[in-house]
UniProtKB/Swiss-Prot annotation:
Signal peptide: none annotated. It comes from Methanococcoides burtonii (strain DSM 6242 / NBRC 107633 / OCM 468 / ACE-M). This is 2-phospho-L-lactate guanylyltransferase. Its EC number is 2.7.7.68. PANTHER family: 2-PHOSPHO-L-LACTATE GUANYLYLTRANSFERASE (PTHR40392:SF1). It comes from the Archaea. Pathway: Cofactor biosynthesis; coenzyme F420 biosynthesis. Guanylyltransferase that catalyzes the activation of (2S)-2-phospholactate (2-PL) as (2S)-lactyl-2-diphospho-5'-guanosine, via the condensation of 2-PL with GTP. It is involved in the biosynthesis of coenzyme F420, a hydride carrier cofactor. InterPro entries: CofC, Nucleotide-diphossugar_trans. GO terms for molecular function: GTP binding; phospholactate guanylyltransferase activity. SUPFAM superfamilies: Nucleotide-diphospho-sugar transferases. Belongs to the CofC family.
Length: 215
């Protein structure tokens, strides 16, 4: 099997712009990518590919394959799948809470397709045993789309339910989950820039502007 990580560094995570500058966001997404790669390494996934429109922000110590693609997430992944002849794990680069144990469990299921849903109807991870028969459809409500595609292909399916694996870091409030539950480099980065505020409601982040230099 192989793992593939779609990745964007340049001007990434614009929804975090209220709390992180462009430079900070680009550094942050690289650290999240490193955490995802570590989870794959911990699960003993040997073959790891990165799909990206630019090699900017790829960790210097990454030993896998980097494929430069044209813009367009679905087109890039579908072209990759059409050329694949072994099971493929598609994992997003903004999942710093995913662990090696999650990966091992996901690839251990016997079903043809394993789907890890994300927040708001997204798809965080897809494990596809017959990738050249499958077409991804990210954006909008991709979780429903991928369930429907699997059904149309008459393939068996397993939904992997995990809070940590379903938590992608897109919005400022997601940083709270990273600080509470993370263990990797992205968490360390966040803790240097944010504090937490507790009260009667949910935990909120507070910006440590003097530490981050954010304006």
């Amino acid at each position: 099997m192989r793992a593939v990580i779609p990745y964007k560094n340049e001007n990434a995570k614009s929804r975090l712009s209220p709390i992180l500058s462009k430079k900070d966001r680009e550094e942050f997404v690289e650290l999240m990518l490193k955490d995802v790669i570590k989870a794959l390494d911990d699960a003993e996934v040997v073959n790891i590919d990165i799909l990206t429109t630019s090699a900017e922000g790829i960790p210097n110590d990454f030993n896998g394959n980097v494929t430069i693609t044209e813009p367009g997430l679905n087109d890039s992944i579908n072209e990759y799948l059409q050329n694949a002849n072994e099971p493929i794990l598609i994992i997003m680069a903004d999942l710093p809470l995913v662990t090696g144990d999650h990966i091992r469990k996901i690839i251990s299921f016997s079903e043809d397709v394993v789907i890890v849903p994300g927040k708001g109807g997204g798809t965080n991870i897809l494990f596809i045993r017959h990738p050249n028969e499958f077409t991804v459809k990210y954006h909008d409500c991709s979780f429903i789309s991928h369930c429907e595609i699997t059904d149309e292909l008459d393939k068996s399916m397993h939904i992997f339910d995990s809070f940590l694996a379903s938590t992608d870091i897109d919005e400022p409030h997601d940083i709270v989950e990273l600080m509470l539950h993370g263990k990797g480099q992205a968490k360390e980065y966040a803790e240097k820039r944010f504090g937490s505020e507790t009260g009667k409601g949910r935990v909120k982040i507070s910006h440590l502007s003097k530490l981050s230099g954010f304006v």
